[in-house]
Amino acid sequence: MNKNLLVFGFLIFVKIGETSKKFPLRAFVASTDIDNDTAHAIIEMLRLAEMTFNALSDVDFDVLLGTRDLPPMEMATMMWNLNRIICDEMKLGYMLMLAGTNFKNYGIYEDIANHMKMPLIDWEPSKSENIGKTTENNPMIFSVAPSAEQLLIDYIQYKGWRDVVYIHDGKNADRTLRTMFSYLHEKSPKYQLFVDNYVAPSDEEMFKEFLNEFHRRISTQHTLKSNDSSEEIDEPIPVNVIVDLEGSYRTRAFLRALEESVLVKKEYHYVFSNFDVDETDLSGFHFSLINITIFRIFDKNNKKFLKTRAEFHDVYRGGFSNTDSIPTAAAFAHDAILVAGKALQIAMNEHGKGIFDKSFVRHQLFNRGRKGLYCRPHEDQTESRQFETFEHGKKIAEAIKKVVLTDKDGTLTGRIQFDKVTGKRTNFSAEIVEIKPGVNSLNSIWERFQWAEGEGFLLGGERYVQEKKKDSSQTRKGILPSKPWQLRFNVVTVLVKPFVMLKRRNPGEPELKGNDRFEGYCIDLLNLLAKNITGFEYDVFISDGNKYGSRQADGSWDGMIGYLLNETADVAVAPLTITQERERAVDFSKPFMTTGISIMIKKPEKQEFNIFSFMEPLGMTIWIFTLSSYFGVSLTIFLVSWFSPYEKRIEFKRGEFTVTNEFTLYNSLWFTLAAFMQQGTDILPRAVSGRIASSCWWFFTLIIVSSYTANLAAFLTLERMTPPIESVEDLANQNKILYGVNEGGSTAAFFEDSIVPLYKKMWNFMVSTTQKQIELEKQSITNSTSNRIFVSSYADGIEKVRTSKGKYAFLLEETTNNYESGRRPCDTMKVGQNLNTLGYGIATKIGNPLRVSLNLAILYLSEKGELKKLENKWWYDRGQCDTGTSDGGTSSSLNLSKVAGIFYILLAGMVLSMCTALVEFLFRKNKENREKERNRMRSSRPLKPGILASCERAKQKQLQNRRTKSEEVSTPRSTLF
C-alpha cells in the first residue's frame, strides 16, 4: 500500500514538473524622447501575448518574458552601451531575443546574434542588405514585420506610373530602392521607372515647411515644362509620391503636416509605404484635393483582433485615443511572442521534450554545462572560461524557419511564415486603402485592393462607391450613382424624451407608419439635416432593448454601436454621448448639444409654517443674545443712573423734600423695552453716562430691527422648498438617500473609469449596495428587483425617483433631467452643478464619408441658431410646470398660517393684561381694607391724657419743621442736592 502511494506521488511530482517548465525570453524595447507612448504600448502587448500563449491548453510549457527598457542613446556611444546591456542580460540567460531594430542599432543586434548564435525575432522590417534569395542571409534574425517593396512595385505597376517621387529618411533609401528595382527587373524587365529622391527632415516640426517647399518646387517644374512644350497641356501632370519614413510617430507627423500644407493640388497622390497609417488618420483628407493610399495588414473584422484590441485598451489607455486600432509595432511585437513560443514547441517536438531540461536550473542558464552565457569570457571571474556560443541557438533558428501561424493561432497580422534563406516574412497578405475625396464628400470614392505576396492583387482590384442600401451589407461595385444619393440611410435611435418619442394617435386617425411614427428633438434634427444635405433620405428604427451601446467581454458591441459595426444601420442619431471608448469603435460628428451628468431628486414638499414662523428670520442664537443684551443693558442703565449724581432729583412730597431717581430697575426695563420696540417713554436719561448707554442700545436696536424686518418680509412672502442635498458632495457624504445610474450607459462608464476620488467613492458605494441588494433578493421569497439602484433605462430611473419618497437620487444627463423636471406631475428637480461636460454626437461607422457632411451641416445649423430653437421648442416652450423664481421659491401673498403667531401673542398679551389688572385690583382692595381696619382699631382705643398731650406737641413740631424747610427752598440760595 505504501509502495503504491510512493509511486503515485512520484508520478504527480513528475507531471507537475513537466507542466511547470518555463523558458525565458528577453525583449529589448527602445524608447525615445518624442514617442515614449509606443514603447509602453509594445510592452503591454508583449505581456498580453505572453498571457495568451501561456493560456494555450495544447502547450506543456510556459514562456517567461523579461523586458528591458532601453533609454535614448547617443549615436557615438550606442554601440558600446547597447552591446553591454544585451551581454549583461545574456549572463542570466534566455532562449530568444526579441527587439524592434532600426538603422542605428541593427548592426549591433546582428553582430551579437551571429557571434553568440542567439536567435533574434524582430518586430520591425528587415534591415538586411542582402536582396536575392540566392545569397545566404543571417540565419539568426527573423522579421515579423514584412517589407513593402514588392507591394509597392505591384501597386506602381497596377497604376501604370512611370515617374514617382520618393520621400525617405535617407538611410533606408538605397536598400529599399535596390530591392524594388531588383524585384521589378525580375518581374517586368522592360518596365521603366524613374524615381526622384527627396530626404525628409530629421526634425518632425520641419515637415510642414519641407512640404510647402516641395509643392512649390513641383509647381515651378510643371510651369516650366508647360512653357517649354509646344503643345498645350489640358490636364495637370500627376505627381505620385511614395513616403517611406521610419516609425509611426514620424509617419503621423508627416500626415498632419500634409493636411496643413499649402499649394497641394488634386494631381498629387501620396502613398505611405509602411503599415503604420490607419483609416482614422485620413479623416482630415475627406475634403482635400489629393489622393491618399495606405497599406493595412490588420483585419479589423476578425474576432481575435477585436478581443485583443479591447484587452489592450483596458490595460493601456494612453497615446492612442483617436483610433480604434492597435499601434502597428505593438501588434507585430504581439505576434513575435507567438512565433517564439511556436518555435520552442517545434524544437521540442523534433529533438525531444527534454532537450532544454539541463539548460535551466533554478532559473539560471547553463550553457554546455557552464553557468551563464558570456559575450566576453574574461568577465567570468569564478572559473577559466573559453568562448562558447549558445548550444541551442541553431536548433531554435531552424525551428523558427518552420513556423507557420495564421489568425486561427491568435496572430493579429495574418499569416506568418519566414523565408528559410533570408529570414524575412513571406506569403503574407495586405489590404490597400485609397481615398479619393471629391467636393461632395457623400460621393467620395474609396478603392480597396486585396494583395497577396506572389499573387498580386486578388480579383484585379475591387473598386466601389460608398453607397448604402436597405441591406447595407451589400455594396455596389464598379459604378457611380447616376443621381446623388437616391438610396436611403438606415438611422438607428432610442426612445428617450424629448429626443425621440412615439406620436400619440388620436381616435379615428389612420395608423402612423415609417418616420411619421416618431417625434422629438432628434427627429426635427434629422429633418433639418435632410434639408441641408443633398439627397439625404433615411428610415428610422429603434435599437433593440433601447440600448445605446456598450462593449461586451468578447470585444463586440451591443445597442446602436453594434448596429453600426455590423452595418445594419448607417447612422445613429440619439442622445449618444461621445466617449473615448465609443470613439475607438465608431466615428462621431461634431456635438449637436452639450450637456453633463446631473443629479435628479424628488422635489421636496413646500415648507410648512408654524405659529412661531415670525421668529425664523433670526436664528435662535441671535434671539438668545438679544434677550441677554436686553437684560444687560437695562441693568447697566439702572446702575449708572444710581451712581451718577446728575441723574438724581429732589421732590417735595407729602410736605417733605426727598431725593429720588426715576431709573429704578422697573423703569430701566421699561425704557429699554420701549426703545427696542421703537416706542417712546416719559423718562429719559439726564446723565452723560446714561445717555451713552442708551445711544448704544438705540443703535443696536436699529440694526437688529431693520435686519429682522428685511428678512421677515422675504421669509414670509417666499415659499421655499429646501432640498435634502444641494451638491454631489452632499450626496456622496450621506447614506440616507441611495443613488444609481443607467446600467451599461456612458454615465456608468464615467463613474467606473473615473480617477477622481469622490466619483470612485460613489461608484464603489453603488456597486457594494447592488451586491447587498442581490444577496437580499436571493434570501427573499419574492425575489423582487425593484429595489436595485442600477436601472435598465432612464424611464425606470425617473419612475424610481418619483416612487421612492425622496430616498433615491438618479444620476443622468442634464438634458433629460431638465425635461422631466418640467413635465407633470412636476415632482422632480435637478440639484447641484453638472459633474462633467459631455457632448451628444451623431455616430457613423469608421471611414464613412457621410460624417464630414454631417459635421458641416451641424456647424451651419449651430451658427444659424437652429439648434437653439429646437432646444427651446422641446424643453421650455412645452413645459408643463411653473418654474417659479430662480432662487428656488415662489412669491405669494401672506396668509394666516405664516403670521398666526403674532395674533396668538397679541391675544395672550390682552388676556395677561386683564388678568394682571384683576390681580392688581384685588391686591389694592385687600390693602385698603387692611388699612381701614387698622385705622378703625386705633380710633376705638382710648388714649391717656399724657399721651394725647405728647402727640399734640409732636404734630405741632412737625408742622413747624415743614414751614422752615419751605422758607429755605424759597430763598435764592436754595439748590438741588
Curated annotation (Swiss-Prot):
Residues 954-977 are annotated as: Disordered. It is found in: Membrane; Postsynaptic cell membrane. Residues 20-621, 717-898 are extracellular. Residues 643-695, 920-977 are cytoplasmic. Glycans are attached at N36, N227, N291, N427, N532, N566, N783, N895. GO terms for molecular function: glutamate receptor activity; transmitter-gated monoatomic ion channel activity involved in regulation of postsynaptic membrane potential. It is a multi-pass membrane protein. One of its GO terms (biological process) is modulation of chemical synaptic transmission. Its main location: membrane. Command interneurons of the locomotory control circuit (AIA, AIB, AVA, AVD, AVE, PVC, RIA, RIG and RIR) and motor neurons (AVG, M1, RMDD and RMDV). Belongs to the glutamate-gated ion channel (TC 1.A.10.1) family. L-glutamate acts as an excitatory neurotransmitter at many synapses in the central nervous system. The postsynaptic actions of glutamate are mediated by a variety of receptors that are named according to their selective agonists. Required for response to mechanical and osmotic stimuli. This is Glutamate receptor 2. It comes from Caenorhabditis elegans.
